[in-house]
Structures are given as structure tokens and as C-alpha cells.
Curated annotation (Swiss-Prot):
<dbReference type="InterPro" id="IPR004431">
    <property type="entry name" value="3-IsopropMal_deHydase_ssu"/>
</dbReference>
<keyword id="KW-0456">Lyase</keyword>
<dbReference type="GO" id="GO:0003861">
    <property type="term" value="F:3-isopropylmalate dehydratase activity"/>
</dbReference>
<comment type="function">
    <text>Catalyzes the isomerization between 2-isopropylmalate and 3-isopropylmalate, via the formation of 2-isopropylmaleate.</text>
</comment>
<comment type="subunit">
    <text>Heterodimer of LeuC and LeuD.</text>
</comment>
<protein>
    <recommendedName>
        <fullName>3-isopropylmalate dehydratase small subunit</fullName>
        <ecNumber>4.2.1.33</ecNumber>
    </recommendedName>
</protein>
<keyword id="KW-0432">Leucine biosynthesis</keyword>
<comment type="pathway">
    <text>Amino-acid biosynthesis; L-leucine biosynthesis; L-leucine from 3-methyl-2-oxobutanoate: step 2/4.</text>
</comment>
<dbReference type="GO" id="GO:0009098">
    <property type="term" value="P:L-leucine biosynthetic process"/>
</dbReference>
<dbReference type="InterPro" id="IPR000573">
    <property type="entry name" value="AconitaseA/IPMdHydase_ssu_swvl"/>
</dbReference>
<comment type="similarity">
    <text>Belongs to the LeuD family. LeuD type 1 subfamily.</text>
</comment>
<keyword id="KW-0100">Branched-chain amino acid biosynthesis</keyword>
<dbReference type="InterPro" id="IPR015928">
    <property type="entry name" value="Aconitase/3IPM_dehydase_swvl"/>
</dbReference>
<dbReference type="InterPro" id="IPR033940">
    <property type="entry name" value="IPMI_Swivel"/>
</dbReference>
<dbReference type="Pfam" id="PF00694">
    <property type="entry name" value="Aconitase_C"/>
</dbReference>
<dbReference type="InterPro" id="IPR050075">
    <property type="entry name" value="LeuD"/>
</dbReference>
<dbReference type="GO" id="GO:0009316">
    <property type="term" value="C:3-isopropylmalate dehydratase complex"/>
</dbReference>
Length: 201
């Protein structure tokens, strides 16, 4: 998993509440178990017209936001059915951080497992970040995970909280496999000792 320390980039404003996982990645894209290639399906029902062409009104199709690394979204982001394809699609598009006032629990947990930082802020701070994001490529946000702060283009700072364990995993790039491998010496020692005690196993 790619490490997350300090991220600087354009933030796209998605001023919608209750964005569910079917809106993030519709069901027709769930046939694959590959994590790559899902970026094209991200928000596809809003992003594309019926004929498959880009919807110019959708934020991620606008030139200022096509390379966005940060998504500033409305309340209750990631609600709906459980599908890990949702963070996969965001990551494949290039989104490494989502900022909102609240997230659905399963989506929130899945973000951490896939190297995406979900940041919870107050409504007041979200409105400020929406204002920053509205400026597009003329203003970038800096997400400083070690310092637990979001720095705006005009020097404003928004602090955020994060579980220390999840913070360490993101900074060190540790997913579930990486965490298990940290225990590899202890696992190997146990297997050796167990084999000596019970060689018939």
C-alpha cells in the first residue's frame, strides 16, 4: 500500500449529501476483483451522458478538476451497500483523500485499508474548504497527516482527529498483509517451536 504522509493537490467540490456507494461505483462495474481500471466507472451515472460522452456539468469532467487528488463532499458520504470497489474506484481515479462531515462506517473503514484518508471536519470547516475547492486549479489544499491538519491556499488551517493506529498504518503504508508481515519473525518462531513439540502435525 502506498504511504500517505503529506498530500498536496487540487480539491474537487462535490456538494451532494448522502452520496452512496452505488453512486460512487454502479453495480455493473462490480464484476471484477481487480483494483485497477475502476476509475472510469467512478460516479459514472453523473459523469457521463446517456450516449457515453462526458457530462460537462459534472465536477470531475471540468478541466480544473480532472487531476483532483482530494474530494470535498457533503454529509454521510459512502452510505448504502458495502462494496470495497468504492474506494478502489476513487483510488484508481487518483483520489487519496476525501473530506466530509461524516462517513458511513463500512466505507470509512475500507478507505483506510486501501490507502485513502477519510477526514471528518465540522460543517463550518467544510464550508470553508468548499470555498477553497471552488477556486479549482488556482488553489490547492495540503493534507498533512503527521501534523493532522489541512492547509488552505490562503494559509488557513483546519485540524482533524484520527485514530493513532490508523494514522500509523497510512504513514507507513501498512495494509492487512503488511501488518501480518510485521509479525513474520514471531510467526516463524512459533511454527518452528510447534513443529519441534508436535512433529506429527
Amino acid at each position: 500500500m502506498e504511504k500517505f504522509t503529506v498530500l498536496e493537490g487540487v480539491a474537487a467540490p462535490l456538494k451532494l449529501v448522502n452520496v452512496d456507494t452505488d453512486m460512487i461505483i454502479p453495480k455493473q462495474y462490480l464484476k471484477t476483483i481487480k483494483r485497477t481500471g475502476l476509475g472510469t466507472g467512478l460516479f459514472s451515472e453523473m459523469r457521463y451522458k446517456d450516449d457515453g460522452s462526458d457530462n460537462p456539468d459534472f465536477v470531475l469532467n471540468q478541466s480544473a478538476y480532472k487531476n483532483a487528488k482530494i474530494l470535498v463532499a457533503g454529509d454521510n458520504f459512502g452510505c448504502g451497500s458495502s462494496r470495497e470497489h468504492a474506494p478502489w474506484a476513487l483510488l484508481d481515479f487518483g483520489i487519496r483523500c476525501v473530506i466530509s462531515t461524516s462517513f458511513a462506517d463500512i466505507f470509512y473503514n475500507n478507505c483506510f485499508k486501501n490507502g485513502i484518508l477519510p477526514v471528518v471536519v465540522s460543517k463550518e470547516d467544510l464550508d470553508k474548504l468548499f470555498d477553497d475547492a471552488d477556486r479549482g486549479a488556482n488553489a490547492t489544499l495540503t493534507i498533512d497527516l503527521p501534523a493532522q491538519e489541512i492547509r488552505g491556499p490562503d494559509g488557513g488551517v483546519v485540524k482533524f482527529e484520527i485514530d493513532p493506529f490508523r494514522k500509523r498504518c497510512l504513514i507507513e503504508g501498512l495494509d492487512d498483509i503488511g501488518l501480518t508481515l510485521e509479525k513474520a519473525p514471531a510467526i516463524a518462531a512459533y511454527e518452528t517451536a510447534k513443529g519441534a513439540e508436535q512433529p506429527w502435525l
